């Protein structure tokens, strides 16, 4: 797979936030294996740095654990190996493609899994991405479809993530979101109405990063064009930005 498909590189403070798509490649789940549906939520509350600090304090058993903290440090590290990719990029690529993990990657997965806790509040998380999630759902080129066609195809789809996924609870701190320093190249904007049961850990504080667990349930509730444009690195022209609203639990 070309390097660009494993996510962007050079994100300051958390290269895990630069991942563009494979971390959220979703697999539709149908029939008897389908997860339970999200509960009905009337209000989603904004998440703050204070909320994050309080949740960390309430889960000191995890956040004081040296193995979890070492795995978390590796996950958000900018350091790359001989392949040119970070620890998290390689881990997520292998998880998405069902490849064997090396000892270091298995340690990361085990320790991150041990540190996962429910976010505890019905809140909204934000993510900027490329169109990998659409391609995983059978849409080869969303720019050739109307908004109505996309809604008919996608709304109501329930799926599960196959790897870890980075979000921001404060969109002003995510450099890849629209309007931010590196936001011009991401054509898919995902708004996640995360229910309190969504399991996660905190990544880079400077980017208000929340990393959700492998196997997180997602259900698409809305799809629309927001009237803005992006210029992805792998495209030769600007394309309309699409917003996908999901619920997670």
Protein language model features and the residues they cover:
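Mono-ADP-ribosyltransferase
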Residues: 39-249
